[in-house]
């Protein structure tokens, strides 16, 4: 399973639309779309740059809703990443209903602890939207298992502590963590943060992961080389995971 990340509106919303359509045809199994945010604590330099560019170009939520309407017919599931402050200001139930109406399958909220998510969980359950929880190498075993059981779609395992980026060193506990999660859930496990090379994809697969999430590398290629180069590169990365 290859999950490709795009920042909505970077470098512009039409390019995002084109990228979604082409990645869906070139091997992405899931496309994660990040909502630009000025205080995205989990973002490294590349994704911060992408968010800043989108916001400077005047991105607002109407652009997101229009984008989702225009790519609604693709067969690849869409997942939205947004920070809770964005969701809260828009209105939690209104936000969830909007995503479901646009055929979005999952929601990632990186700054919302599970213990503080009761309202969002209840609303998502009501409308059939999956929350995808993040599990890191520093998450204690009991909490990791609780989060794994709460995931109804796939599980996002962070390869190391810190922010997103192209840094390639994975935490040494990752293989063990994947094994422990496999004991308590049948949900697919995808590894993200720092994945940008075919060799890494093959290594992650050898650890038992069911997928990889590629964000910073996708946005770097998109911003520097364009949609066609990104879609061809994704095709190569997909073949590394599924030869």
Swiss-Prot record:
InterPro entries: Aldolase_TIM (IPR013785), RibuloseP-bd_barrel (IPR011060), Trp_synthase_alpha_AS (IPR018204), Trp_synthase_suA (IPR002028). SUPFAM superfamilies: Ribulose-phoshate binding barrel (SSF51366). The active site is at 32 (proton acceptor), 43 (proton acceptor). Pathway: Amino-acid biosynthesis; L-tryptophan biosynthesis; L-tryptophan from chorismate: step 5/5. Belongs to the TrpA family. Keywords: Amino-acid biosynthesis, Aromatic amino acid biosynthesis, Chloroplast, Lyase, Plastid, Tryptophan biosynthesis. It is an enzyme of class 4 (lyase). The keyword Amino-acid biosynthesis applies. The alpha subunit is responsible for the aldol cleavage of indoleglycerol phosphate to indole and glyceraldehyde 3-phosphate. Gene3D superfamilies: Aldolase class I. GO terms for molecular function: tryptophan synthase activity. It is found in: Plastid, Chloroplast. Its EC number is 4.2.1.20. NCBIfam families: trpA. The keyword Oxidoreductase does not apply. Tetramer of two alpha and two beta chains. This is Tryptophan synthase alpha chain.
């Amino acid at each position: 399973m290859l999950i490709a990340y795009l920042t909505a509106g970077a470098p512009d919303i039409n390019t995002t639309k084109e990228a979604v359509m082409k990645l869906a045809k070139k091997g992405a199994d899931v496309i994660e779309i990040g909502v630009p945010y000025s205080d995205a604590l989990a973002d490294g330099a590349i994704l911060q740059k992408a968010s800043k560019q989108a916001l400077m170009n005047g991105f607002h939520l109407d652009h997101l809703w229009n984008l989702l309407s225009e790519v609604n017919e693709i067969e690849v599931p869409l997942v939205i990443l947004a920070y809770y402050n964005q969701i809260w200001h828009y209105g939690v139930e209104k936000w969830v209903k909007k995503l479901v109406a646009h055929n979005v399958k999952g929601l990632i909220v990186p700054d919302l602890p599970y213990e503080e998510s009761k309202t969002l969980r209840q609303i998502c359950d009501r409308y059939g939207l999956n929350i995808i929880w993040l599990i890191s190498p520093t998450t204690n075993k009991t909490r990791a298992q609780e989060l794994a059981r709460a995931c109804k779609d796939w599980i996002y395992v962070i390869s190391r502590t810190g922010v997103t980026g192209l840094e390639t060193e994975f935490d040494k506990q990752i293989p063990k963590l994947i094994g422990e999660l496999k004991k308590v859930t049948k949900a697919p496990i995808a590894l993200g943060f720092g994945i940008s090379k075919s060799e890494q994809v093959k290594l992650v697969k050898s650890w038992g992961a069911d997928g990889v999430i590629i964000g910073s590398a996708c946005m770097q290629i998109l911003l520097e080389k364009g949609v066609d180069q990104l879609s061809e590169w994704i095709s190569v990365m997909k073949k590394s995971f599924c030869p």
